[in-house]
């Protein structure tokens, strides 16, 4: 490109080394930093050019993009600069700007000085191209999320200003409608702030700011705690006042010293009304085996062991510990009647078996069946 041609303001088609084509209006050319700035840029993708990473075209129009000169493959002028209805060359005019923001970017196409009245690309954040109204009308809030940095020569994407200034504007707009602590709007004339042209995507954000200002902070913290808790944790916990507290370890020696076995045996016999039927003899102790117990035949059982001797291997295999169960022993007829009253009439009866015989037959009935199966398997009979 020759230096005599006024390319500023013309429509440029630029192809990067990543084979992505961009179209935009030439804004500035920085020879010191070797950068080219385009305004109103649109990406057309790779367009079937050979590349390892193909990119589809995008419909978004970016406010400006600054390209690195070393990463530009080809530049083509598509359209000459549009004729602008500028003011006559009056030496009294130092600088002028039109009412609309887009027309201010084409003031640089004055033939006598293309760079007069035009700020450099480093001052674009304060220029009319990045004004709040123009950025809101194009919806530039969503541009930082566009993955344009796949191309290595894109140095800087569209910026909408620092976040702190935007947050201050939102807070000021939220404070524009004063509200009492009780939630009642104040009556009378109120000064309304100047309306901001905010895109629809930013409208819910302002609504949440107003809601947060109206809610007390304690209520929000309480709601936040209740979300993380389950229903059972919200209920007040009751502490038992009559909890048993143990001061030290249990002393077994002291407990054994207080434990008298003979006195407990006497109390136990008195409660059960034990009767001693055997006569006492001279020089012999009174036996404890005179408890009347009846079996199924009605004959009393005698204790084969001596007094206070609960198990003697030489006399009998059985012990004398379960004497309480002997006094409460019932016949098979009584137990069958009790089972019928409790569980009802069963579908299968034990034919001709007493309680003890039926019990042994129930447990031992599987043994002859296994023996019969073994004999059949051994003899080969089916």
Swiss-Prot record:
Identification of the protein by name: Protein LSM14 homolog B
GO biological process: regulation of translation
Residue ranges with Low complexity bias: 166-177
Gene designation per UniProt: lsm14b
Quaternary data: Component of a ribonucleoprotein (RNP) complex, at least composed of cpeb1, lsm14b/rap55b, ddx6/Xp54, ybx2/frgy2, pat1/P100, eif4enif1/4E-T and eif4e1b. Different translationally-repressed mRNP complexes probably exist that contain either lsm14a/rap55a or lsm14b/rap55b depending on the developmental stage. Component of a ribonucleoprotein (RNP) complex, composed at least of elavl1/elrA and/or elavl2/elrB, igf2bp3/vg1RBP, ddx6/Xp54, ybx2/frgy2, lsm14b/rap55b and, in a subset of RNP complexes, stau1/staufen.
PANTHER family the record matches: PROTEIN LSM14 HOMOLOG B (PTHR13586:SF1), SCD6 PROTEIN-RELATED (PTHR13586)
Domain Sm: 1-81
Species this chain originates from: Xenopus tropicalis
Function per UniProt: May be involved in the storage of translationally inactive mRNAs and protect them from degradation. Plays a role in control of mRNA translation.
């Amino acid at each position: 490109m020759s230096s005599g041609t006024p390319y500023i303001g013309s429509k440029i088609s630029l192809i990067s080394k990543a084979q992505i084509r961009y179209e935009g209006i030439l804004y500035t050319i920085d020879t010191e930093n070797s950068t080219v700035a385009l305004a109103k840029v649109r990406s057309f993708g790779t367009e079937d050019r050979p590349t390892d990473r193909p990119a589809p075209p995008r419909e978004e129009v970016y406010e400006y993009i600054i390209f690195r000169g070393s990463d530009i493959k080809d530049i083509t002028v598509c359209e000459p600069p549009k004729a602008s209805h500028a003011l006559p060359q009056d030496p009294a005019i130092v600088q002028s700007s039109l009412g609309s923001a887009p027309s201010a970017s084409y003031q640089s196409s004055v033939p006598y000085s293309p760079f007069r009245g035009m700020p450099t690309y480093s001052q674009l954040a304060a220029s009319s191209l990045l004004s709040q109204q123009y950025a809101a009308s194009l919806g530039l809030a969503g541009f930082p999320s566009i993955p344009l940095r796949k191309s290595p020569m894109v140095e800087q994407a569209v910026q909408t200003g620092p976040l702190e200034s935007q947050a201050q504007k939102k807070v000021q707009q939220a404070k524009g409608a004063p509200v009492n602590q009780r939630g009642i709007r104040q009556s009378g004339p109120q000064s309304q702030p100047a309306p901001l042209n905010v895109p629809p995507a930013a409208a819910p954000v302002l609504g949440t700011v107003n809601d947060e200002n109206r809610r007390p902070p304690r209520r929000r913290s309480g709601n936040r705690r209740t979300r993380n808790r389950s229903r059972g944790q919200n209920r007040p916990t009751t502490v038992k006042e009559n909890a048993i507290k143990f001061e030290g370890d249990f002393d077994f020696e002291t407990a054994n010293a207080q434990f008298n076995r003979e006195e407990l045996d006497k109390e136990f016999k008195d409660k059960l009304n034990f009767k001693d039927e055997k006569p006492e003899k001279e020089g012999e102790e009174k036996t404890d085996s005179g408890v009347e117990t009846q079996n199924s035949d009605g004959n009393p059982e005698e204790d084969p062991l001596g007094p206070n001797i609960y198990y003697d291997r030489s006399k009998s295999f059985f012990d004398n510990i379960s004497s309480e169960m002997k006094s409460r022993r019932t016949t098979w007829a009584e137990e069958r009647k009790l089972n019928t009253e409790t569980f009802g009439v069963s579908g299968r009866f034990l034919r001709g078996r007493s309680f003890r015989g039926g019990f042994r037959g129930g447990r031992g009935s599987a043994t002859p069946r296994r023996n019969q199966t073994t004999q059949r398997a051994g003899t080969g009979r089916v």
